[in-house]
């Protein structure tokens, strides 16, 4: 159950951080206005709390692993929301990052 919970928290973290950054981007770069920016800031703040719910006690480990989730999640967000089409190098890089996440978070430690 610990791994499943951890993975779900990574997904929630990705949605809150990437979604928040996207909302700020839309508000500023796409001139959608301050409401979008404010919503984005709220989502980004929520992301900060989600990370604290991870079962591992080490901040550095969690944030390092989340970096890999962020890479893959950002590409997925781009596909789903902005019509981005990743090339094979994007996909290979994301796969390498996710492998790193698995090693950092779920390798058996002695």
UniProtKB/Swiss-Prot annotation:
The keyword Cell membrane applies. The keyword Membrane applies. It is found in: Cell membrane. Keywords: Cell membrane, Membrane, Transmembrane, Transmembrane helix. InterPro entries: UPF0060. It is a multi-pass membrane protein. GO terms for cellular component: plasma membrane. Pfam families: UPF0060. Signal peptide: none annotated. The chain crosses the membrane at residues 8-28, 33-53, 62-82, 87-107. PANTHER family: UPF0060 MEMBRANE PROTEIN YNFA (PTHR36116:SF1). NCBIfam families: PRK02237.1 (NF002586). Belongs to the UPF0060 family. This is UPF0060 membrane protein Francci3_2786. It comes from Frankia casuarinae (strain DSM 45818 / CECT 9043 / HFP020203 / CcI3).
């Amino acid at each position: 159950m610990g791994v499943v919970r951890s993975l779900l928290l990574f997904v929630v973290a990705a949605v809150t951080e990437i979604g928040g950054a996207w909302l700020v981007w839309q508000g500023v770069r796409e001139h959608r206005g301050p409401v979008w920016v404010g919503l984005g800031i709220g989502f980004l703040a929520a992301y900060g709390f989600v990370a604290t719910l991870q079962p591992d006690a080490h901040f550095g480990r969690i944030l390092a692993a989340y970096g890999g989730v962020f890479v893959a999640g950002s590409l997925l967000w781009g596909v789903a929301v902005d019509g981005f089409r990743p090339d094979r190098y994007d996909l290979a890089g994301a796969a390498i990052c996710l492998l790193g996440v698995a090693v950092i978070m779920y390798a058996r430690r002695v």
